[in-house]
């Protein structure tokens, strides 16, 4: 199955335990497909020290001319809550410039997960279409610190 807009593959093999339930990121992708202002997305889990479960981070690549503001975040949260459940709602919905993908258009979730969890990404090889975009995800490894600083 392919994401209607970018034609990237919808299937997501990564399954994690988020908020006490086990689900795959593809469940979120199906909901996000209904947002015309979103060009593509990727989701992964982030486990902080001391957390029993991972929290969900949802990254959105917005269509040109669209911005991820609080109104869009609210609509995304409400759609996920309605179509899936309240436990599927991501902890954070964040805007990125690009989504890492393979040459055939499949999202590379494990790389994003490695980076946002402060780990060195697993071997990328030559199959990644846009390796330069991975650097942007490094700033989300210390997301709680960044949020605290912004609130000051």
Set out the residue ranges of the language-model regions:
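Hydrophobic face of alpha-helices
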Residues: 25, 29, 73-77, 109
């Amino acid at each position: 199955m392919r994401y209607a807009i970018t034609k990237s593959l919808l299937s997501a093999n990564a399954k994690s335990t988020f908020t006490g339930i086990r689900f795959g990121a593809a469940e979120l992708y199906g909901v996000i497909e209904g947002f015309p202002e979103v060009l593509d997305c990727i989701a992964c889990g982030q486990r902080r020290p001391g957390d029993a479960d991972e929290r969900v981070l949802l990254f959105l690549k917005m269509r040109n001319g669209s911005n991820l503001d609080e109104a869009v975040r609210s609509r995304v949260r409400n759609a996920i809550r309605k179509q899936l459940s309240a436990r599927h709602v991501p902890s954070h919905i964040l805007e990125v410039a690009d989504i890492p993908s393979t040459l055939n258009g499949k999202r590379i979730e494990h790389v994003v997960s490695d980076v946002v969890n402060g780990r060195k990404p697993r071997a990328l090889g030559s199959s990644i279409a846009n390796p330069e975009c991975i650097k942007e995800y490094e700033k989300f490894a210390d997301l709680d610190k960044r949020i605290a600083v912004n609130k000051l």
